């Protein structure tokens, strides 16, 4: 690739829209035929729907292809052959890598990749990192456990592909990671938004280190949670580290489907060379291209071979921006990041509530700590929302005013009232991977 441009692949990333749509349709047809011909699972659901690969001739025809739900993926892996069931499109002997989902929404889903898939996966991530300014001069620290979750495996290989020097910090604890980043003058790292904030907090409280002044970090890539596209959370992270923070959203089932570029346009580019993203209206169930109208993301990985991902219902809620980006890429932009999961965006007291709205308010108050927890319960016939927060040390005397302001902002942002508990600083749960701060306990009889 040309390291003197701002694009990893200038030809693809600036391709005229009509040509890009033609490329996606061609790839979708190829992926559908591959799955139909080689995966008993996909062939079964397509035959049940009366669908033949040759039926797909236009982008609109794609909407007739049955969606795949996560529960379907869980069910198929209970079948023979172990451990994936009959979903694979390659012989088991061609599988080189096992991954699984984190299990935060239920039984983990197993995922298989071939060596060809892993090369593709690193290429999709190279688009992400290069757009965020990673170059061969960077020393990149990756502070994740290198375990069975996909997390930053692809990012590691992509950083190497770009030419970066990669420091794998998996076995180190948080304090050791910070010290190693300082020692090696690392210029970039990757983590969940929760862990980005947690590392800065640990550095200050346990090591007496101001990471914005004593480390050399210039850019941070976030994944796993919506936080890096929530303006107040992004500002906290950038303020704590004195670095640019970029969002990325992916999934084990699909791959690295989106990224924020260096322009930080307030949304994410869909990695359209490799993925087809559709948005399904939450109310009508129809596919919509209407900017500003949120819906569930239906995603197809256009080049995945071992375990195809065709029209997977991610349950992630996004919306199109409808605006171009100043970076010059023709890949479409979302408006903001992932707004939440369709499973989490729920009616409380008759009002639709997105957990990201609560995070945006909490993180906007400088007197509050980074951590919080939301519990939705039933008290008799009425819904009740309990929000647990932490005051920063030294702010105890300002508690009354802070909480009054917090309640006002929450009501303005969400049109709901909250019970608020203040907990000692450092007492709420801390997370390294995906944080589960929003808990709807109403269905559990709480």
Model feature map: region roles:
Residues 1-100, 106-123, 130-131, 381-388, ...:
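Nucleotide 5′-phosphate-binding alpha/beta core
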Residues 35, 101-104, 140, 189, ...:
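Conserved S/T- and glycine-rich ATP-binding loop of Class I adenylate-forming
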Residues 115-128, 139-198:
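AMP-binding/adenylate-forming
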Residues 134-138:
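Short helix-loop-beta connector
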Residues 139, 206-228:
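Conserved helix-loop-beta element of the AMP-binding
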Residues 189, 298, 303-414, 433:
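AMP-binding/adenylate-forming catalytic core of the ANL superfamily
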Residues 196-216, 235-238:
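Adenylate-forming
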Residues 222, 227-324:
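Conserved AMP-binding/adenylate-forming
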């Amino acid at each position: 690739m040309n390291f003197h441009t701002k694009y990893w692949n200038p030809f693809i990333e600036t391709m005229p829209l009509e040509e890009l749509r033609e490329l996606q349709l061609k790839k979708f047809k190829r992926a559908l035929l591959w799955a139909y011909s080689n995966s008993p699972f996909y062939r079964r659901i397509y035959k049940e729907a009366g669908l033949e690969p040759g039926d797909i001739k236009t982008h609109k025809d794609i909407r007739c292809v049955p969606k795949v739900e996560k529960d379907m993926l869980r069910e198929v892996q209970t079948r023979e052959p172990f451990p994936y069931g009959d979903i694979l499109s390659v012989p088991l002997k061609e599988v080189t890598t096992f991954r699984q989902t984190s299990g935060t929404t239920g039984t983990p889903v197993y995922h298989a990749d071939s060596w060809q898939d892993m090369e593709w996966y690193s290429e999709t991530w190279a688009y992400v990192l290069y757009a965020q300014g990673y170059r061969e001069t960077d020393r990149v620290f990756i502070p994740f456990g290198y375990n069975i979750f996909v997390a930053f495996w692809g990012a590691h290989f992509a950083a190497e592909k770009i030419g970066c020097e990669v420091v794998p910090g998996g076995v180190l604890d948080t304090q050791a990671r910070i010290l190693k980043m300082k020692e090696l003058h690392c210029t970039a790292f990757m983590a969940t938004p929760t862990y980005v904030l947690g590392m800065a907090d640990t550095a200050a409280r346990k090591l007496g280190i101001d990471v914005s002044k004593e480390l050399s970090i210039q850019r941070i890539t976030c994944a796993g949670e919506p936080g890096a596209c929530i303006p107040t959370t992004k500002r906290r992270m950038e303020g704590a580290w004195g670095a640019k923070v970029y969002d990325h959203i992916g999934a084990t089932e699909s791959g690295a489907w989106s990224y924020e570029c260096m322009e930080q346009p307030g949304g994410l580019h869909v990695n359209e060379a490799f993925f087809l993203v559709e948005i399904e209206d939450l109310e009508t169930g129809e596919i919509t291209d209407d900017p500003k109208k949120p819906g569930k993301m239906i995603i197809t990985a256009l080049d995945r071979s071992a375990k195809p991902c065709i029209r997977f219902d991610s349950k992630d809620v996004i919306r199109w921006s409808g605006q171009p980006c100043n970076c010059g890429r023709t890949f479409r932009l979302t408006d903001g990041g992932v707004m939440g999961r369709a499973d989490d965006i729920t009616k409380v007291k008759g009002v639709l509530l997105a957990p990201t709205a609560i995070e945006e308010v909490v993180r906007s108050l400088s007197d509050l700590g980074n951590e919080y927890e939301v519990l939705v319960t039933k008290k008799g016939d009425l819904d009740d929302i309990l929000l647990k927060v932490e005051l920063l040390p030294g702010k105890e005397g300002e508690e009354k005013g802070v909480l009054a302001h917090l309640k006002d902002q929450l009501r303005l942002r969400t049109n709901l009232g909250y019970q608020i508990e203040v907990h000692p600083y450092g007492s709420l749960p801390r997370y390294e991977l995906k944080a589960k701060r929003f808990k709807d306990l109403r269905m559990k009889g709480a």
